From Swiss-Prot:
It comes from Psychromonas ingrahamii (strain DSM 17664 / CCUG 51855 / 37). This is Small ribosomal subunit protein uS19. The lineage of its organism: Bacteria, Pseudomonadati, Pseudomonadota, Gammaproteobacteria, Alteromonadales. PROSITE patterns: RIBOSOMAL_S19. It comes from the Bacteria. One of its GO terms (molecular function) is structural constituent of ribosome. Belongs to the universal ribosomal protein uS19 family. GO terms for biological process: ribosomal small subunit assembly; translation.
Amino acid sequence: MPRSLKKGPFIDLHLLKKVEKAMESGEKKPIKTWSRRSMIIPDMIGLTIAVHNGRQHVPVFVTDEMVGQKLGEFAPTRTYRGHTSDKKTKKK
């Protein structure tokens, strides 16, 4: 179920402060965050945010199509390496 409109978007306060500071200074350095639950707001457009996926920080360049989605959607946590092949059937 989606979040109620009367509540507004959720964004962690420490991340919001980092975004505002980066917008004021005009820095292009990636902003590191562990907050996958924060929603992307229009102030973040054009910034690179390094989102933690449990192992490393994945750089995410924010565009206008991403507004309204969560940061964690762009940093996958699981790697799929494919199913192992059955060696018995390959020999035939």
